[in-house]
Amino acid sequence: MTKITRIIKEARDQARLTALDFAQGIFENFVELHGDRSFRDDGAVIGGIGTLNGQPVTVVGIQKGRNLQDNLRRNFGQPHPEGYRKTLRLMKQAEKFGRPVVTFINTAGAYPGVGAEERGQGEAIARNLMEMSNLKVPIIAIIIGEGGSGGALALAVADKVWMLENSMYAVLSPEGFASILWKDGSRAMEAAELMKITSHELLQMEVVDKVIPERGFNNHELLAAVKEEIAAELDSLSQLPLEQLLENRYQRFRKY
């Protein structure tokens, strides 16, 4: 098994920690909130409020299931537009009350169904990008598994973007890339090598700001390590004047 094959397999592993695992394992007294107040609740997206060392934090994430029944409930981690609108509702609420935002991302991409398109999937993603770029509180985004296309980017316009070591982040899946470029989905691993989707490659290209090691950690230790990193970064970001925070975020993405 090649390195890229192993990373993709691990990124998609159903046994990986989910967004809800991180929310409940890192933030004390996490309370999940539901619904976008326009259409319905989307099971593919979780969000709520918890505390980190006594500081209130808004947490949102994209949730995959661990079995078929759970994946059907979670739509295999592919959010509908109401899911993105739920995250925006919670992030604007965080802005109102001065709470920092932490996002956990694990999705192959936004749901591409007809109903999702009719309800404004593209608009929902675009609005998240626009609103997050000017959200007046610190934002940390962490890719914990797959980071696929605009569906992932819709939660990743942040002051700091991190990846777990065995996660991936790309404009589309390697299978989709191979099908488009060569009309042959079986060449997915070859496509993955060209796409530069691994955490260390993206860190080198400055697409992400930090890689959190996984090797040698059990789940409890990984949660503790991520908690420590988040606490330290939020403390640092909270020291910045608002104008500087927003300018740094703008320049972070403008350089691409």
From Swiss-Prot:
Q: In which pathway does it act?
A: Lipid metabolism; malonyl-CoA biosynthesis; malonyl-CoA from acetyl-CoA: step 1/1
Q: Might you name a Gene Ontology BP term for this protein?
A: fatty acid biosynthetic process
* Every CoA carboxyltransferase C-terminal domain range: 1-236
Entry keyword set: ATP-binding, Cytoplasm, Fatty acid biosynthesis, Fatty acid metabolism, Lipid biosynthesis, Lipid metabolism, Nucleotide-binding, Transferase
Look up the domain of life of the source: Bacteria
Q: Which InterPro entries match?
A: Acetyl_CoA_COase_a_su, ClpP/crotonase-like_dom_sf, COA_CT_C
Q: Where in the cell is it found?
A: Cytoplasm
In terms of SUPFAM superfamilies, this protein maps to:
ClpP/crotonase
Which protein family is named in the record?
Belongs to the AccA family.
> What do we know about how this protein assembles, alone or with others?
Acetyl-CoA carboxylase is a heterohexamer composed of biotin carboxyl carrier protein (AccB), biotin carboxylase (AccC) and two subunits each of ACCase subunit alpha (AccA) and ACCase subunit beta (AccD).
Official protein name in the record: Acetyl-coenzyme A carboxylase carboxyl transferase subunit alpha
